[in-house]
Amino acid sequence: MVFNHEIKGNTLVLKLSGDLIGEDTGSSVLETASNAIQDKVLKCIIDISALRYINSSGIGVLITILTKFRNKGGDVYLMKPSESVQKLLVITKLNAIFQIIQSEGEVL
């Protein structure tokens, strides 16, 4: 998996691509999110439009990020999930926990 990030105001924007398939893969993403929270960033947009595959460990990474932000009064938004990832979100009922958005403008 490859990711990059940017902070826009009080929002962390993470762009993930490839496969999110484990704690090792997601550890740097978690570290980036934790650092942003320490810097008083309250919102996180995770652009998953280029994410091809996600397994249970990858879902755990997303849930950990969500928990960290919500514990500080913030929130996490998943942006533009692919059809296969969207199906997974529905099957796992995570679409009811995460807010799904189509553009950064819905949050920024």
Q: Across the structure, where does each feature detected by a protein language model lie?
A:
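Absolute protein N-terminus
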Residues: 1-2, 108
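STAS-typified acidic loop motif
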Residues: 3-31
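A short acidic, often aromatic-flanked loop/helix-cap motif at beta-alpha or helix-coil junctions
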Residues: 12, 106-108
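Amphipathic alpha-helical interaction surfaces in cytosolic regulatory modules
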Residues: 20-98
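Acidic phosphotransfer microenvironment of two-component signaling modules
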Residues: 83, 105-106
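Short acidic-hydrophobic, aromatic-tinged amphipathic segments that line or gate anion-handling sites
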Residues: 99-103
